[in-house]
Each structure stands twice: as C-alpha cells, then as structure tokens.
Amino acid sequence: PVENNWLVALAHGHFHFAEDRDQRSSPIYPQEVADAGCHYLALGHWDRHVDVSQGSVTAVYSGCPLGPIGSPGAGEVTVVDLDPQTGVSYRQVAIN
C-alpha cells in the first residue's frame, strides 16, 4: 500500500479454505489474499457475505442484492468505508 492512497482490488473465484479439496475452478488461496498488497479486496462469485480477510488485507464476498439462490428477495450488499483514521471497515445492508 502507498501512503495517502487507497488500493482496492477485485477478484472473482472461490476462496480456498484449509479443508477444501483442489477441485474448484478459479481458486483464491489465503496467501494470495495476504500478498495482494491492497487495503480492500472485493471478491465475487459467491452469493452470500463471507469475510476471508488475511493478514492486513480486508477481503470480503459482498453478498447478493437479489438474495442467495433459492431465497429471492432476501438480498444484502456490503458497504465499505475507507477512513484515514480508522482504516477499512464494512457493514452489511439488507436489500428488500
């Protein structure tokens, strides 16, 4: 990260938890997240909110505004705040 600048990155794929087998397409490994060199990594592909932050990198699957598959109308999104005093924070917002 560069002082006085926010580095935000986007990635699309499956986060690889320790218990996962290497059978998913587009794996994102924990060390790749930790080494991303950004303040916030916005992740996509999953339709639910999951925080997979590693090291100093905040990494979050945002959820889906339409709701998870099979649960239409129960959506949520992630609102991210980048504050020079407090760093990266986020909150989930329900979409009705």
Residue ranges and their predicted role:
Residues 1-59, 64-69, 74, 81:
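His/Asp/Glu-rich metal-coordinating catalytic cores
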Residues 69-96:
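C-terminal functional module detector
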